[in-house]
Amino acid sequence: MKSFIARALLVLVLASFSQFARGRIGADIPWTTYEAEEMTTTGIVLGPKYGPFLVETESSGQKCVKLRAPGEYVEFTVQSSANAMVVRYSLPDAATGGGIDSALAVYQNGKLLKELSLTSRYTWLYGKYPFSNKPQEGKPRNFYDECRLKDLSLLKGDVIRLEKNDARAPYCIIDLIDLEQATPALAAPANSLSLAEFGANGRGEMDDTEALRKCIAAASKQGKAVWIPAGVYKLTGDIDLPARASIRGAGMWHSTFVGAPELYGQADRRVRFKLNGSNIRLEDFAIVGGLNYRNDLEANDGILGNRCDNSVLSRLWIEHTKVGMWFYYSSGLMIEGCRFRNTVADGLNFCAGVRSSLVQNSTTRGTGDDCFAIWPAPPDQAFATLMPGSNVVRHCTGQLPFLANGGAIYGGADNRIEDCLFTDISPGAGILLSTTFPTSSEQLKVDNNFSGTTVVRNCELRHCGGFDHGWEWRAAMQFCLDRKSIS
């Protein structure tokens, strides 16, 4: 225990004081956030409130604005030019669960710009972990969703109004609005095969699963990349990626893979990219699933990697899947510039057998479990010799999960969380070092408990620490010796 205490103090000193000497903390954020409670409004400002099962607590800064009657609005002045918008909002659930639909009108300088379609289909979970969609079980969480709007032309000084113009929902709550100057759509890279050549049209109306599979097979055979032109592409099954496969899109705002809502209840019909070999590259596209419940017996959708050494995943936007990314038995991974939004579980998890891997300059918001996790779970027998460790979470920003923590390390050797920003972590700790989850196997004589030196350095925690469903109250930064000592 003495060893644990000494090391814990070292970590806390580094976290508390080194930020003043080491420069930037968190990810590079290309958007400007406008908080609803700071806007001009005819609605009601809610909060701050601090406690479980409250929409205010799940809000940025624990404040938000509630629009009730048609005609009520929030309004703000644009600080810098932008062509893309994200609105974080909350609608009520249907009386029996399943969500409702509504709309908001967006005005620019008094002129109707766009009507946003909103839904609560992917929010509202209830009861005990892993939660349900049944309102009668009480204890609600996961109040918020987001919608994206692009191809705008907003100038500094423009006045933007979001107005409730729809009576289908008794209210609409606005938490925040992000404005961003999204980069133009990228051109096709040299030495690539276009998905369009295999029958996909980019309108999101047809099933593009087989077209993508054929394009990947042909590109791999020819040693070329797969090119995803700007557009929307529907996927209804697994996309298996062999070694050295490369998929490149026109940008996370431009090339989007979506799931089929009517099929998303079937675990094998979801949007799932499976990395099954080394040196794979995924770049510049978005994945938008359709998951609205958690079942840990079902395979994760999003991106899964197994034995995918030295793979690079850059500038991906992943939303409405169970996890953003989950990796096993891999080394030398590089994840950079990614956004994980509104997942049902983790944003990113370096799980069993992951070593010498890095996630950097990436962000999460609205995840249903840890924003960024390092969990060296017990290995399968075939991988018992792979020792996890030396993984790094660096220059990342985690915000507003509805369960669990910002950055979490559950064991392993010499793992690090550095230069990170965690804000509004109301259901858990900003940073958690814990032995709660299993990391050892007596049968395989493997023990992946904490070893070497675990480092948390130059991190900033804002509005962190709160009610955890299993542990009641968490600290802003917590050491949890649940099943084993840390020594």
Stretches with model-predicted labels:
Residues M1-L9:
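Bacterial N-terminal signal peptides that target proteins for export
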Residues A8-S16:
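Bacterial N-terminal signal peptides
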Residues R24-P189, R457:
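Extracytoplasmic
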Residues G71, N165, N201-R203, G223-V232, ...:
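Extracellular beta-strand-rich, repetitive "passenger/adhesive" scaffolds
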Residues L195-P229, D240:
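Acidic Gly/Asp/Thr-rich repetitive segments characteristic of extracellular carbohydrate-active
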Residues R213-A218, Y233-R248, S255-D284, V288-N310, ...:
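Extracellular beta-strand-rich solenoid/capping regions of secreted or surface-exposed proteins
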Residues A225, R270-R272, Y293-R294, N300-G302, ...:
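Structural detector of coil-to-beta-strand junctions
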Residues A250-W253, S278-G289, D309-K322, S331-A345, ...:
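Right-handed parallel beta-helix
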